[in-house]
Amino acid sequence: MYQTTAALRSAFLEYFRTNGHQVVDSSSLVPVNDPTLLFTNAGMNQFKDVFLGEDKRSYTRATSSQRCVRAGGKHNDLDNVGYTARHHTFFEMLGNFSFGDYFKREAISFAWNFLTQELKLPKERLCVTIYETDDEAFDIWTKEIGVPAESLIRIGDNKGAPYASDNFWQMGDTGPCGPCSEIFYDHGDHIWGGRPGTPEEDGDRFIEIWNIVFMQYNRQASGEMLPLPKPSVDTGMGIERIAAIMQGVHSNYEIDIFQALIKKTAEILGVTDLENKSLRVISDHIRSCAFLIADGVMPSNEGRGYVLRRIIRRAVRHGNKLGATSSFFYKLVPTLIEVMGDAAKGLVETQAIVEKSLKAEEEQFARTLERGLGILDGALNELKGDVLDGETAFKLYDTYGFPVDLTADVCREREITVDEAGFEVAMAEQRSRAQAAGQFDTDYNDSLKIDEETHFSGYTELTAQGKVTAIYKAGESTDSLNAGEDAVIVLDSTPFYGESGGQCGDKGLLTAKGVEFDVKDTQKYGQAVGHQGTVNSGSISVGDTLEAIVDKKLRHRTELNHSVTHLLHAALRQLLGTHVTQKGSLVDAERLRFDFSHFEGVKPEELKAVEDLVNTQIRRNHKLSADVMDMDQAKERGAMALFGEKYTDEVRVVTMGDFSIELCGGTHVGRTGDIGLFKITSEGGIAAGVRRIEAVTGAAAMAYVAAQKAELDQAAALLKADSNSVVTKLKAQLDRTKLLEKELSQLKDKLAAATSADLAGEAKQVNGAKVLIKKLEGVDAGALRGLQDELKQKLGSGVVVLAIAGEAKVNLIVGVTKDLTAKVKAGELVASIAAQVGGKGGGRPDMAQAGGTEPEKLDGALEQVLPWLEERLA
C-alpha cells in the first residue's frame, strides 16, 4: 500500500479532502510579498496572512503538499546534503491547517488515524512529544487516543529562554505562537539513537515524522502570552521521511524518487557504485534547481539567483568528481518529471526552459572549473595545517566562480576547513574598492533626509501651483535662495515626477513674478519630491508659492519609452518564456534600457519577433488604464510585480489592453498607438543570466531608421548597387576578396621560397651550426613564419633570426632546428631580443615569435644575437 511517493502524496491529500479540507496547490518557491523569506520553506508560508487575520479565505480547513527549499539564509541545509540520510535542499511538506475551525482534539485525531489506520503503521513504533505544560494535549493523547503514558514525552524550555523549546512554536518574537506535539517513528534497535529528550536523541533511530502546532497565544513585545480568540492549527510532515518508512528503508535517499535519479545519474556518467555520496548530492540538487527555475528564479550573482547558482555549481563539481566530461545535469529533468508525478505540473510546462538554463549554467562553469580545482588542489597540497586561508577561497570565488561553500565542500573531503571569516574580510575589501572606484564627485543632495511630504499631481496635470516647504543648499537646510545658487526645492504639491521605478525625473521650471528656477532633475526623498536645479533670476524663500511647469516634450518622450517597456516585458515573456523577469530598467526622454533574466543570448530571429510583437501591440492602439487597488486584488487580476520593488498595501496597476498588466507608479501614454514605432538598437549580456535590450521609440525610432537607411544607401553607392541588392553584391565582393587573399598567400609562399634560397647563402658557421640573423625589407609580417620554416629546411642544422622594422613596431621570429633545441631555446632567444626593443614574446623551443615598439633599437639588439649564440653553441 502506498509504495510510491506519488501514491502517498495522493492518499494524504484525499484523506484530508474527505475530512472537509480544501486541497490547495503548492505555492511558488518564491514567497509572494514576504520580504522576510528567501524561499518558501514550510507549508504554512502561503497561509501566513490567514493565520495573522490579514487575509480571508473561503475555507477554514486546508491541506497541501508544499514544495520547499532550504539553502541560503537562516535555513540552510546545503553543507550537509549528501552526507546525511535526511538533509535536502528541496523537500515536500505535507500539511493540514485549521484557521479558527478545529483545534487540538481534531488535529491529533486526524494525524493519528492517518498514520495508524490509513498507513497502518504499528502503534508501538510511534512515540509523541508534547510541550511540558500542555496538559490538554497530554489528556487527549492518553485518554482519547489511547497512547500509553510511557510513549508520551514532555519537553520543556530546552533552548535557554522561556518558551524556547523544540515543542513550542512561534512565528517571530511577537505574534501567533503555541505548543506543539511531534510524532516520532522508531526505526528499530539495530540503529543507534535514543528517544527524544535523552542524550542520544540526535541518533537516527527515532525520527520525527509529523509536527502538529497549536497556535493558541498572541505573544506581546513584553513577553506576555494572550489567548487568541480563534486558535488555529498548522501541521507538517516531510513526505520523504514518511515515504522511507512506507518503503521499508531508513535513508531518504533509498526511496523511489531518489533511487530513480541516482540510477539515471549513474547511467549518464557511467558510474557503478550507487552508494557514492556524489550521486546523492546530484539527485538532491536537481530537484531544487529544476523547481526554482520553473518558479522563475534564474542563475545570477545576487539574491535567490546566486543561491541557485551555488547549488548548480555544487552539483556540477560532484559530477566532475565522478568523471563527467560534458554537460550532464540538465539530462536528469525528464526523469525528475516522471518520478514527481502530479507535483511536477509546473515543471512540465517549463521543461524546455529549465533544461536550457541548467545546460547554459553548467557549460559556463565548466570553462573555469578544471583550472579552479587545479589551483585549489595545489593550495591544499601545500597547506600546513587544516585551515584554508580566506584569501585563497576569495580568489577562487572572484576569479573562477567558486562559491565559498563549494570550496568548503572540496576541503571537507580532505578534513580541511575554510577560514570563512577571512573570506568575508576579503569580500568586504573588494566591495570597499569598488565603492571607492565609483565615487567621483560628492553630491550632498543624494543623501538628504527630508521629513516633508509632497502630493504628486503629475498623472493628470503638467502645470500646478505649489508652496515651498523646504530648501536645501549643499546638503544643508536654508530659508532662502538668490540668483545663481544651486539647490533642492521641496513643494507641498507638484506635477514633477521624481525618479523611481527606472523612470528619470522630470525637468522644467519653477516660476513666480520675477523668479525663475531651472529644474534640471527631480528626485524622491522619502515622501518628499525634491526639485534639483539653479535659480536663474530673483530670489526664493520657504513659504513662497511657485508655478511648477513640467517640460511637456521631455515628459511625453519619456512616457513613450516607459510604456513600451511594459509591452517589451510582456513580449519577452510570451516569446522567450515566463522565466523572463525584469532585472532593471532606465527610461528617459532619449531611449530605454531594459535588463531581464535569460540564460542565453537572444537570437536575431527571436529579437525580430519581439520587436514585431511590440509594434503589433502599438498598432492595436490599446487604451491604457491605471487603477489603484489593494495588493490582493492586483494579484487576482494577474498583475506582474517586479522582484526587489517594495509595495504598499495599495498599489497602482497599469493595464494595456489584454496584453500587459503590471504594478507601476510611473507616467504613461494614453494609448499604445501614441508610441508610434519601437526599434531595438542593441542586445547583449551584462552579467551571467542577465541580458540587456536598448531601444528607441517615436521620433527617435524614426531617426534611427532614417540613419540606418542612409548608411545602407551609402554602402550601396560604394558597391555600385541599388539598396535592394547590397547583400548580394557584398557577398560577391567578399568571395572575390577571399580568392584574392588565397592567391596573395600563394605568391607570398613563392616569394618566401625564392627569398630563402638567397638568404640561406648568407648564413654563418658557428661551432658547426649555421646561423642566419637578418633584418628584412619589403617582406610582409605574415610571411615570416613560412620563411623561417623554409630556411630551417635549407640550413639543415641551424638557427634563424628574422626581423622586420616598421613605424613604431618590430616583428621578430626565431627558428631552431630540433637537433639544437637542447642548447638553444627559440623562446628564450626571442624574449632576449624583444626585451631590447620594448616588447615581449615566446613560444616553443623550435619556433618563437615576439613584437616590440622601439624599432630604432633593433640593429643594436640583433648585434647581440651572435655572441649570445656563440656562448650557447660552444
Curated annotation (Swiss-Prot):
Subcellular location field: Cytoplasm
Signal sequence segment: none
Annotated PANTHER family: ALANINE--TRNA LIGASE, CYTOPLASMIC, ALANYL-TRNA SYNTHETASE
GO molecular-function term, one example from the UniProt record: zinc ion binding
Catalytic activity: tRNA(Ala) + L-alanine + ATP = L-alanyl-tRNA(Ala) + AMP + diphosphate
Keyword terms: Aminoacyl-tRNA synthetase, ATP-binding, Cytoplasm, Ligase, Metal-binding, Nucleotide-binding, Protein biosynthesis, RNA-binding, tRNA-binding, Zinc
Stored HAMAP family: Ala_tRNA_synth_B
NCBIfam families reported for this sequence: alaS
Any GO CC annotation of this UniProt entry: cytosol
Cofactor dependency: Zn(2+)
Known function: Catalyzes the attachment of alanine to tRNA(Ala) in a two-step reaction: alanine is first activated by ATP to form Ala-AMP and then transferred to the acceptor end of tRNA(Ala). Also edits incorrectly charged Ser-tRNA(Ala) and Gly-tRNA(Ala) via its editing domain.
Lineage: Bacteria, Pseudomonadati, Pseudomonadota, Gammaproteobacteria, Alteromonadales
Domain notes: Consists of three domains; the N-terminal catalytic domain, the editing domain and the C-terminal C-Ala domain. The editing domain removes incorrectly charged amino acids, while the C-Ala domain, along with tRNA(Ala), serves as a bridge to cooperatively bring together the editing and aminoacylation centers thus stimulating deacylation of misacylated tRNAs.
UniProt remark on cofactor binding: Binds 1 zinc ion per subunit.
KW Nucleotide-binding (keyword) present: yes
Gene Ontology BP, a term: negative regulation of DNA-templated transcription
SUPFAM superfamilies associated with the record: Class II aaRS and biotin synthetases, Putative anticodon-binding domain of alanyl-tRNA synthetase (AlaRS), ThrRS/AlaRS common domain, Translation proteins
Residues the record lists as binding Zn(2+): H562, H566, C664, H668
EC class name: ligase
Annotated source species: Shewanella woodyi (strain ATCC 51908 / MS32)
Protein name: Alanine--tRNA ligase
A Pfam family recorded for this sequence: tRNA-synt_2c
UniProt-listed InterPro entries: aa-tRNA-synth_II/BPL/LPL, Ala-tRNA-lgiase_IIc, Ala-tRNA-ligase_IIc_anticod-bd, Ala-tRNA-synth_IIc_core, Ala-tRNA-synth_IIc_N, Ala-tRNA_ligase, Ala_tRNA_ligase_euk/bac, DHHA1_dom
Chain's gene name: alaS
Family according to the record: Belongs to the class-II aminoacyl-tRNA synthetase family.
